[in-house]
């Protein structure tokens, strides 16, 4: 962050540059300018402190700085040399003791150096018209080869130059060259004009081909139908009902959703591993396959029917494996547990049956 001392030092540095230019110095190193500025600031503070000390030593009632305080401070610092410091015997009584101050006054009023310094301190039109030379790699190529490249952007450069000329003429007619602040503002406006001219035009039809640009909202037919007011974002209400109503009233927004397009619907989406030829063959073979399945079912039913029928052609044989309701299905061994155990023992140890 810049402090106050750095800010004032930079302002004083501009004055030193103008003084050096008025004395005939066209250029100087930045380090030399900084040294001259530092010496000027030190000497000015020394002069101010000397004037203040002399005014305090005079013991005046109002404690104001008088002209003799400044004169004596200039003499003490050696800026003005007095004609006669002490004339004890009054040998040169007719000689004026303020002759040095009179010469200093004449130098301040009639000096050509100060006049040149004032002229140098004023802003000039050349400061606004100064342009940096840019290296042109096509300068070595003949004009008949790079004529198209040279004519590229010539119209835009001409418009920028005309705007700069109008701005400078307006500043001259309004006597704006006597004020550095007006000149700085004009310089900033010119920089903005130059910066805007260097930007490439963002024209949508002039852009190169982009994949998917035809169905995009930036396409030409969408670009011509939409107004500038439609492109501005509208503030949504905090309630969901109002937002839903606004969306329903403006179907153009929902029509731009990808899901609203036919090619993006689920029934129209096919996977990469699906074979369309197999699907077509399946559609052709579908009726034959159904008829074959029906024949298999009929043959299966006939086989089951043949198994259930009697080999002798008698209906009574069908129920040969069915038990009568009077037949007791329980074994005799279940009635007598002892005989059951004996039977099992005989079976295990090789007894009689």
Curated annotation (Swiss-Prot):
Residue stretches making up the Histone-fold domain: 11-78
Entry's localization field: Nucleus
KW RNA-binding (keyword) present: no
CDD domains according to UniProt: HFD_SF
Signal peptide extent: none
PTM annotation (Phosphoserine): residues: 310, 346
Function: Functions as a component of the DNA-binding general transcription factor complex TFIID. Binding of TFIID to a promoter (with or without TATA element) is the initial step in pre-initiation complex (PIC) formation. TFIID plays a key role in the regulation of gene expression by RNA polymerase II through different activities such as transcription activator interaction, core promoter recognition and selectivity, TFIIA and TFIIB interaction, chromatin modification (histone acetylation by TAF1), facilitation of DNA opening and initiation of transcription.
More details: Present with 3300 molecules/cell in log phase SD medium.
Name used for this protein in its record: Transcription initiation factor TFIID subunit 3
Organism: Saccharomyces cerevisiae (strain ATCC 204508 / S288c) (Baker's yeast)
Gene designation per UniProt: TAF3
